């Protein structure tokens, strides 16, 4: 990425990373449109692609950080944005496939408020797991397993990215 300005590098990195994650959102809606019903095939494909994209994203970030020194604030902001994107995508899968148990309160999401899906994904992703929402179907449990694995890996990956950035480009020492 030599010869590019920092803003150009960020735009290129964003295109490489964000666009595939956004395209992943098409899967749950495509299944209903193309097949006419929910067969869960695209759910399984989508969850597999989440792991593949996660690995590619980590590889791209490591490569990006190897070539230039970056301020830690950008790494932190990127980490938070990436966390929100992952949880949002997993929430879309949970909403579209209706993977959480029903509640007596009617809403546009087949019986659960939208915030419950996002709350469930965040709590599972951070491996807190309060236990107030428990998936009842095999597909819901599979989503919980994938979310917990990604969440546990995500924290370790963030530490590895920070350490890699610091070891490649240690902070300058004050000479006084």
Q: Where are each of the predicted segments found?
A:
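Membrane-water interface at transmembrane helix exits
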Residues: 28-32, 62, 66, 93, ...
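Alpha-helical transmembrane segments of polytopic integral membrane proteins
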Residues: 54-62, 89-93, 97, 127, ...
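Membrane-interface segments at loop-to-transmembrane junctions
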Residues: 3-8, 71-81
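Transmembrane alpha-helical segments of multi-pass membrane proteins
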Residues: 46-49, 75-89
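Transmembrane alpha-helical insertion/packing segments
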Residues: 1-55
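Outer-pore turret/helix-boundary of cation channels
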Residues: 84-119
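Pore domain of cation channels
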Residues: 112-171
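Membrane-helix interface/capping segments
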Residues: 56-77, 99
């Amino acid at each position: 990425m030599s010869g590019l300005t920092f803003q150009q590098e960020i735009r290129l990195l964003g295109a490489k990373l964000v666009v595939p994650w956004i395209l992943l959102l098409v899967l749950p809606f495509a299944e209903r449109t193309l097949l006419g019903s929910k067969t869960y095939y695209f759910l399984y494909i989508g969850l597999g692609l989440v792991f593949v994209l996660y690995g590619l994203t980590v590889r791209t970030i490591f490569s990006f950080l190897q070539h230039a020194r970056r301020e830690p604030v950008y790494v932190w902001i990127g980490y938070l944005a990436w966390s929100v994107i992952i949880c949002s995508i997993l929430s879309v899968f949970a909403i579209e496939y209706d993977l959480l148990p029903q509640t007596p309160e009617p809403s546009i999401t087949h019986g659960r408020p939208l915030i419950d899906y996002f709350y469930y994904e965040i709590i599972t992703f951070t491996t807190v797991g309060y236990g107030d929402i428990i998936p009842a179907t095999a597909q819901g449990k599979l989503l919980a397993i994938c979310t917990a694995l990604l969440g546990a890996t995500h924290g370790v990956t963030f530490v590895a990215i920070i350490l890699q950035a610091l070891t490649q480009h240690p902070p300058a020492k004050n000479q006084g």
